[in-house]
């Protein structure tokens, strides 16, 4: 599933293959800006992918993504593209939330150098999601501590 555009309203998109089989899990690809028409809570999008949520190699140099991204069994990322430095972009801004089973990264770095993905990354949580998540998006009415570590 390829996704981009301006979101007016409230929607959840899911991509998968059933019955579930890890060899056939499906990914969502955000190939351009995905932005809310309004950031007042009236517009929202949830994207649920069985596998990965991916930014492709030929994405915009400055990219903005609004929404809740959930990679159920995979990663949320810009893939590492070879050769190093061949696909470095300027900036990605996310507004919403990212939920990922595996890695979450928009940048691949070697020392102080970005070698693939986005050089500058900015993330802001959309506090409207607390009381108004996308329709039918998985949620829980209570919180629990999954782990605790004190040093």
What kind of region is each of these model predictions?
Residues 1-2, 45:
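Low-complexity, acidic interaction segments enriched in glycine
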Residues 13:
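Conserved hydrophobic/aromatic pocket- or pore-lining residues that grip, position, or stack substrates
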Residues 39-151:
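Predominantly polar beta-repeat domains that present long G/T/S/D/N-rich surfaces used to bind, process
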Residues 4, 8-10, 42, 66:
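A general structural motif
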Residues 1, 7-8, 18-30, 34-36, ...:
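Extracellular beta-strand scaffolds
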